[in-house]
């Protein structure tokens, strides 16, 4: 039997800003400017939008002009701030056949609680398009309308734990990346993958890892164990308080809830976190684990 051997395939060149992955290349002119920029990541359903929205309000309570950008096709990042699901940038652009010059700022920027400005970038339909394009178009619009000139802090609230080139694109604008995680295996496993993505981006962009925000957890023993192993640190801790769940159902932030010891406790922790971020958190040079090593590290003997 004659067998035809194919010549070996040449190795694909590695992209400059990722561990061999295909990354979305952003326009180098799309620089946000002088605002402090934070990207919030974490496992899907862990409370990133709740964390982002309450952090945005806390920053505004400290006198800062804050812009929150939701980067999720569900476009529900800012609904506790605006009390509704606002149209996405992509929805608005489609209405004008992507002629962005026809848009005004109030077509896609909405004012939320305590003056926090809100934008929902949205995303392409499932299975199509690229989230990086959506983020790029959003930043481009904000730049064209000079909306970033009067902003002190930008918060990117990013889809789930997706760290592909598209939804990793906010890292290309961020100063610090924050990870929301619970004290459980799935959250920490996702956090480890996100750490790897952030470290890959930091080779060619200013973004650095800022730390983890422990959420929905009475204890932090597993997070602490992981942090000690890879060189991470916890920036804030929010227990699984029922007032946080109720605030989402009431479509409001914690800063609008009726006063109670738990509400005050959570508010104070958000204000403390906001103040520490404004003061500047040292960059973390964590070394992510191999997947199998996490299985060996976490849990009980």
Swiss-Prot record:
Catalytically driven reaction(s): chlorophyllide a + oxidized 2[4Fe-4S]-[ferredoxin] + 2 ADP + 2 phosphate = protochlorophyllide a + reduced 2[4Fe-4S]-[ferredoxin] + 2 ATP + 2 H2O
Residues that hold ATP according to the record: 45-50, 74, 215-216, 239-241
Keyword Zinc among record annotations: no
Binding sites annotated in the UniProt record for Mg(2+): 49
Metal-binding keyword on record: yes
Binding site for [4Fe-4S] cluster: 130, 164
CDD domains: Bchl-like
UniProt keyword annotations, A-Z: 4Fe-4S, ATP-binding, Bacteriochlorophyll biosynthesis, Chlorophyll biosynthesis, Iron, Iron-sulfur, Magnesium, Metal-binding, Nucleotide-binding, Oxidoreductase, Photosynthesis
One GO BP annotation of this record: light-independent bacteriochlorophyll biosynthetic process
InterPro entries named in the record: NifH/chlL_CS, NifH/frxC, P-loop_NTPase, Protochlorophyllide_ATP-bd
Record region (Disordered): 1-22
Pathway terms, separated by semicolons: Porphyrin-containing compound metabolism; bacteriochlorophyll biosynthesis (light-independent)
Cofactor: binding details: Binds 1 [4Fe-4S] cluster per dimer.
EC code: 1.3.7.7
Enzyme class, spelled out: oxidoreductase
UniProt-listed Gene3D superfamilies: P-loop containing nucleotide triphosphate hydrolases
Record field: compositional bias (Low complexity): 1-13
Record GO terms (molecular function): 4 iron, 4 sulfur cluster binding; ATP binding; metal ion binding; oxidoreductase activity, acting on iron-sulfur proteins as donors; oxidoreductase activity, acting on the CH-CH group of donors, iron-sulfur protein as acceptor
Cofactor or coenzyme needed: [4Fe-4S] cluster
Function of the molecule: Component of the dark-operative protochlorophyllide reductase (DPOR) that uses Mg-ATP and reduced ferredoxin to reduce ring D of protochlorophyllide (Pchlide) to form chlorophyllide a (Chlide). This reaction is light-independent. The L component serves as a unique electron donor to the NB-component of the complex, and binds Mg-ATP.
Subunit structure: Homodimer. Protochlorophyllide reductase is composed of three subunits; BchL, BchN and BchB.
Protein name in the entry: Light-independent protochlorophyllide reductase iron-sulfur ATP-binding protein
Species name: Bradyrhizobium sp. (strain ORS 278)
Name of the encoding gene: bchL
């Amino acid at each position: 039997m004659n067998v035809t051997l194919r010549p070996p395939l040449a190795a694909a060149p590695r992209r400059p800003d990722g561990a061999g992955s295909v990354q979305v290349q952003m326009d180098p002119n799309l620089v946000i400017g002088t605002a402090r920029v934070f990207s919030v990541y974490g496992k899907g359903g862990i409370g990133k939008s709740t964390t982002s929205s309450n952090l945005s309000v806390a920053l505004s309570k400290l006198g800062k002009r804050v812009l929150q950008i939701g980067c999720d096709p569900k476009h529900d990042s800012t609904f506790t701030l605006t009390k509704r699901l606002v149209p996405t940038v992509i929805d608005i652009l489609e209405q004008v056949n992507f002629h962005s010059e026809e848009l005004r700022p109030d077509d896609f920027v909405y004012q939320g609680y305590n003056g926090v400005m809100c934008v929902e970038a949205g995303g392409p339909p499932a299975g199509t398009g690229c989230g990086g394009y959506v983020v790029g178009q959003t930043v481009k619009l904000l730049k064209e309308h000079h909306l970033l000139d009067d902003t002190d802090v930008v918060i990117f609230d990013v889809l789930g734990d997706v760290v592909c080139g598209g939804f990793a694109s906010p890292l290309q604008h961020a100063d610090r990346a924050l990870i929301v995680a619970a004290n459980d295996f799935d959250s920490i496993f996702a956090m480890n993958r996100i750490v790897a993505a952030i470290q890959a981006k930091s080779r060619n962009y200013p973004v650095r890892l800022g730390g983890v925000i422990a959420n929905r957890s009475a204890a932090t023993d597993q997070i602490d164990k992981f942090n000690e192993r890879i060189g991470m640190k916890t920036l804030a801790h929010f227990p699984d308080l029922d007032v946080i769940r109720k605030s989402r159902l009431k479509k409001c932030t914690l800063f609008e809830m009726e006063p109670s010891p738990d509400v005050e406790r959570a508010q104070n922790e958000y204000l403390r976190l906001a103040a520490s971020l404004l003061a500047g958190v040292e960059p973390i040079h964590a070394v992510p684990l191999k997947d199998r090593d996490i299985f060996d590290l976490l849990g009980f003997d």
